[in-house]
Amino acid sequence: AGLSIEDTPRLKLKWAFISLLVVIIIVGNVFIPCDFNFWRKGRIPGEKLLYYREDVAATVVVREYPQGGQLNRVMEVDGTDVAGTDYMLRSTQKFQGHLPLLIHKDPKKVLIVGFGSGGTTWAVSQHNVKRIDVVELVPSVVEAAAKYFTGVNYGVMDDRRVNIKIGDGRNFVLTTQEKYDVILTESIHPIYAGNGNLYSREYFKLCKEKLAEKGIMSVWIPLWALPEQYFKMIIETFRQVFPYSTLWYVPNCLNRQVYLIGSKNELKIDFKSLQTQMSMKKIGKDLEEIGMNNSF
C-alpha cells in the first residue's frame, strides 16, 4: 500500500522530532563536561568543595573556584553566598565595617550582628575601638572563617578586643545590658527565611535602646533580588524608629547596595573630617583596595 496524504504531516513531525533530538545530543556533548564528577564537586569546572558542615541552625559550605586567573573562595549558609574573597564580597565586608565608624568619629564599643568571613569585624578592628562584640548564629561559620578566610579576616578572632558569642542576634540585643556606640548588621539579605527579623521595627527599636547617647546604627540593604516595595518598606520602617537617618549609596561594584545610618539625635556629617579619617594610613589602604577612599 502507498503512503497516504494524511500520513505526510505525521511523518514530517516525526523527522522534526528526531532532528531536534540529534541537535540536543550534539550540543550536550560539546558543552557538558566529560568529567561527571563535575556535578559532585561543584557548579563550575575546577571548583572544589573545601568545607561542609551541618549545624542545628544551618548548613555551611566553603567552595573554591577559578575566576580571572585566580582562585576565589565563597562561604554559603543554607545555599546563599554570605561572604567571600572576590571583589564584590570583599567590598561589602570592608565598607560596612568602616562606614559607621567613620561617621561616628570616636566609637569605643561596637556590636556586630553576624560574622561571615570576619572581614567586617577586621575592618572595625582597624579603628581605635576598645571592644568589639560579635554575635553569630551558626558555630560552623566561625570555624570555617578561621580555617579558610584568614586572607580576609587576618586572624581577627585572636584580637583581645573581639568577643565572639554564638547565638541569635536579636535575642542578644534584647537581653544585653551593654550600651554601644555603633551597632551594625552584617550583609544578611532580607528576602531569605528568618532574616526579616533583622529588618523589623521591633529589632530596630531594640537596637536603638542599646545605643549610647551619641550612638548610631548601620543597616546594609542590597539592591539586587529585593522587590522595590520591600526596599521602600525597610527604609520607612527604619525612619520611623530613627527620624535622624541618612542613606548611603555604594556604586563601586556590580552588586549595588546601600547603607542606612540612624541615630538618636541629629547627626551632622562633616565630609572634610570624613575624608581626613578615610586618608589615615590603615583605613585608607583598606578602602583603596575597593575604590572607596574618597568621600566626595
Question: Where are the language model's segments positioned?
Answer:
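C-terminal structured "cap/appendage" subdomains that terminate the fold
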Residues: 1-3, 116-117
